[in-house]
């Protein structure tokens, strides 16, 4: 606990020169409850035909020993949105909730343009676990996805425990359709063996991702219009399988199916270089869906 507080006070960076950066937002998760001024919850079936139903319940989202814990659970509950005979909407087609989990984000509370994000976290090596640290454009309510832009600082798949990935998504200015360069992968690591620092630097020209200071992904941004020139908000979630990934029965959900986040911090340049644009920070700026 003491080390974590010292790091916060000094603004120490992992894998970057601290002199050029200033801390503009952070959460050390040292309290007893999630800070409602910084975070909101996703609830329900949300995206990607994933199996988990997100809740705001303490068994799925809590603070424990100075960490945010997103915990997967096996349950047998009625789906409150179930519609008998539904075939077109996967969120309403499931009568029973078999898995619950947690997802939190800073939408409507904090958004930023350009800077460096660092997050010290531990991922679960459980089959089907899909924890992520990422951002979405705060204009998603008006422009939708993928036009709003998405930065995947970390995606980890529990069934592939020696690999971490990062990526960006946007809308092509040429085709008007979803575009992505494809994930960059770093193999030969063991991210589930303890806490590691996942980082991302975002400028007007590119997004660069790091694992424990190792640079392993760089993505030019000119192909996506202004999606990465506008504020983004932060998301932390633990997805658990999807119908395109594996059968629901094969997803491993037990007490160890937990995504632990020690801290997350956002930095921006004190003096942006001449060929970049200065970063911005905004509160309560994200638009409603």
Residue map of PLM features:
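GH16 jelly-roll
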Residues: 19-285, 289
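Bacterial N-terminal signal peptides that target proteins for export
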Residues: 1-6
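General helical structural elements
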Residues: 7-8, 269
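Hydrophobic h-region of N-terminal signal peptides that target proteins for export
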Residues: 10-18
């Amino acid at each position: 606990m003491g080390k974590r507080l010292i790091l916060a006070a000094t603004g120490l960076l992992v894998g970057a020169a601290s002199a050029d950066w200033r801390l503009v937002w952070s959460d050390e998760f040292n309290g007893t409850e999630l800070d409602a001024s910084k975070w909101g919850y996703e609830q329900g079936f949300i995206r990607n035909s994933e199996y988990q139903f997100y809740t705001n319940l303490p068994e799925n989202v809590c603070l424990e020993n100075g960490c945010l814990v997103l915990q997967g659970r096996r349950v047998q509950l009625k789906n409150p949105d179930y519609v008998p005979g539904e075939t077109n909407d996967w969120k309403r087609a499931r009568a029973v909730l078999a898995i619950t989990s947690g997802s939190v984000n800073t939408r409507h509370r904090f958004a930023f343009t350009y800077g460096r994000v660092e997050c010290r976290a531990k991922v679960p090596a459980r089959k089907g676990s899909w924890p992520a640290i990422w951002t979405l454009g705060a204009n998603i309510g008006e422009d939708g996805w993928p036009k709003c832009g998405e930065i995947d600082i970390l995606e980890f798949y529990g069934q592939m425990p020696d690999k971490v990935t990062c990526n960006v998504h946007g809308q092509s200015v040429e085709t008007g359709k979803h575009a992505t360069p494809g994930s960059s992968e770093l193999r030969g690591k063991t991210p589930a063996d303890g806490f590691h620092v996942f980082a991302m630097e975002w400028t007007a020209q590119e997004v660069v991702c790091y694992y424990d200071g190792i640079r392993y992904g760089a993505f030019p941004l000119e192909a996506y219009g202004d999606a990465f020139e506008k504020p983004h908000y932060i998301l932390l979630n633990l997805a658990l399988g999807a119908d395109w990934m594996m059968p629901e029965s094969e997803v491993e959900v037990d007490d160890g199916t937990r995504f632990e986040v020690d801290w997350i911090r956002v930095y921006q340049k004190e003096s942006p270089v001449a060929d970049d644009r200065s970063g911005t920070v905004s509160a309560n700026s994200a638009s409603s869906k």
